[in-house]
Amino acid sequence: MCWAVGRRWAWAALLLAVAAVLAQVVWLWLGTQSFVFQHEEIAQLARQYAGLDHELAFSRLIVELRRLHPGHVLPDEDLQWVFVNAGGWMGAMCLLHASLSEYVLLFGTALGSSGHSGRYWAEISDTIISGTFHQWREGTTKSEVFYPGETVVHGPGEATAVEWGPNTWMVEYGRGVIPSTLGFALADTVFSTQDFLTLFYTLRAYARGLRLELTTYLFGQDA
């Protein structure tokens, strides 16, 4: 019996060691990456349009991002609003840019929703265009509320409770191991709603983003 318990502890220690090494490798890899976007750049652009009708703000933001980063923002024919069910909440997102280490998307809810933020190997920032964003951080007993023009930062490994009021819309930028975020983003769709058409739309949007980045890398911005 003692031998069996010892083996279990040995396996647990080995798994922890592997996880620690993997985490270190990942962060070293991220340190070598050349990023297309910057957190503050996205936040500043979004703040310019905060308080406007969200559809007008989004259309102007897309035009500006394409001007600043040609070849890195999906064309109009590839833009699609897709439902997202994750952590108990429901919203919608429109992916503008995606790679293995970055993404930019539009996100929000027309009805309001709340749930778990998820815990990621990525840093995610949301700059609010309209509505309200309530956040309750792990380890605290009070929530914070954010308004149009403010940016909410979700650090790697952090978890919070989130709540968005009706007609809350924002611009989101993520940097880190982006494929690792898909597990949380898709779990409710696979195991709860079983909305496999939405699953297809989500994966297709990410594939389109990766394809655009590969095309731009291989053939340049005018490809």
Swiss-Prot record:
Annotated spans, C-terminal hydrophobic region: 177-223
Sites marked Important for ligand binding: 126, 172
UniProt keyword Thylakoid, yes or no: no
GO BP terms, alphabetized: lipid transport; protein homotrimerization; regulation of neuron apoptotic process
Localization per record: Nucleus inner membrane; Nucleus outer membrane; Nucleus envelope; Cytoplasmic vesicle
InterPro entries: ERG2_sigma1_rcpt-like
Molecular-function GO term, any one: signaling receptor activity
Topology versus the membrane: Single-pass membrane protein
Chain intervals for the UniProt region annotation (Important for ligand-binding): 99-106
Key words of the record: Cell junction, Cell membrane, Cell projection, Cytoplasmic vesicle, Endoplasmic reticulum, Lipid droplet, Lipid transport, Membrane, Nucleus, Postsynaptic cell membrane, Receptor, Synapse, Transmembrane, Transmembrane helix, Transport
Cytoplasmic topological domain: 31-223
Region (Targeting to endoplasmic reticulum-associated lipid droplets) residue spans: 2-8
Transmembrane stretches, start-end: 10-30
Coarse class of the protein's main subcellular location: nucleus
All ranges on the Lumenal side of the membrane: 1-9
Any one GO cellular component localisation term in the record: anchoring junction
Function: Functions in lipid transport from the endoplasmic reticulum and is involved in a wide array of cellular functions probably through regulation of the biogenesis of lipid microdomains at the plasma membrane. Involved in the regulation of different receptors it plays a role in BDNF signaling and EGF signaling. Also regulates ion channels like the potassium channel and could modulate neurotransmitter release. Plays a role in calcium signaling through modulation together with ANK2 of the ITP3R-dependent calcium efflux at the endoplasmic reticulum.
Domain notes: The C-terminal helices form a flat, hydrophobic surface that is probably tightly associated with the cytosolic surface of the endoplasmic reticulum membrane.
Complexes and interactors: Homotrimer. Forms a ternary complex with ANK2 and ITPR3. The complex is disrupted by agonists. Interacts with KCNA4. Interacts with KCNA2; cocaine consumption leads to increased interaction. Interacts with RNF112 in an oxidative stress-regulated manner.
Family of this protein: Belongs to the ERG2 family.
Protein name, as recorded: Sigma non-opioid intracellular receptor 1
